[in-house]
């Protein structure tokens, strides 16, 4: 996990006009997105959507999104979709755990949406939560 310095974060957040803890969370989310983009399997099966996608790729909006919304993109059978979602879940959770995050028991899983909540200790020493949502669209 990247070690974020409280003083440096405070300075950068203030210059950008944001609260330090929210600013740190967005930096952490960007690292997760970099990982997803660097992995061929994840990049092939997932699409970033929602406010984070718009803010980080199209516009330079003065808004900090604090979650990641992903869509499972292949058009597969229910069984194949479930198999790939299982692999994606394992890869994402392994990366997050290796990066110092802990999966919360409040994470939720259903046939159409997985909502991962990952806990970490922020630069201020507080426990914080990172959200990742994975939507799957089973079509056959």
Residue spans for each PLM region:
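Short, glycine/charge-rich beta-strand/loop segments that flank catalytic centers
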Residues: 48-52, 103-118
